[in-house]
Amino acid sequence: MYQFNFILSPLDQFEIRDLFSLNANVLGNIHLSITNIGLYLSIGLLLTLGYHLLAANNKIIPNNWSISQEAIYATVHSIVINQLNPTKGQLYFPFIYALFIFILVNNLIGMVPYSFASTSHFILTFSMSFTIVLGATFLGLQRHGLKFFSLFVPSGCPLGLLPLLVLIEFISYLSRNVSLGLRLAANILSGHMLLSILSGFTYNIMTSGILFFFLGLIPLAFIIAFSGLELAIAFIQAQVFVVLTCSYIKDGLDLH
């Protein structure tokens, strides 16, 4: 007999659940589990590979998959070139492109009804932001040594204000770890919660009677329009994330 678990709270859709678990008595008691976030990240990886396989054709007339992939490639390439430069940017372009595709695909998967929005989880976005900022910091230290800390010293500031301004710059630099991941997760989380609340509200109205069914078409139209906005946000947030990533890498390379 099947058991259906209805979503009673807008936050239930973001709960991480075990889909399959196994206790293995190998090297001690090892608990292996597959969660919904792991499953959807794997689905995102498979979709990304499938998309690039469909786009990889050598025909004179490209198909729609190739055109869309070339558009994404050109967009990310222009971001890298503008934020870094044509020479240094080529070295970091594969990482930035993979990061953009990863975020975009998982944002779009979250738009599918009854799916799981992986990028709405702070544990995932904070892991990415901490890794990126830490990598940019190591890059700056490797390239400039102790001169890297001049990044926290504003040029032309009075000597009396120097300790305070250095402290402010240092706190601002540390906050990148939080702000980069927080921006992505908060936008995806808030949008999905609002859609969930509006959908439940519209469903209750339209199932209350014939008259209310037609009245419910008004919020239903708003939900459709807001879904289009969420689709645009999925692209925008992926772009913002890689733009800021390029900016942090540039700070490590050029100290400004």
Curated annotation (Swiss-Prot):
F-type ATPases have 2 components, CF(1) - the catalytic core - and CF(0) - the membrane proton channel. CF(1) has five subunits: alpha(3), beta(3), gamma(1), delta(1), epsilon(1). CF(0) has three main subunits: a, b and c. This is ATP synthase subunit a. One of its GO terms (molecular function) is proton-transporting ATP synthase activity, rotational mechanism. Gene3D superfamilies: ATP synthase, F0 complex, subunit A. PANTHER family: ATP SYNTHASE SUBUNIT A. It comes from Emericella nidulans (Aspergillus nidulans). Belongs to the ATPase A chain family. Residues 1-8 form a propeptide.
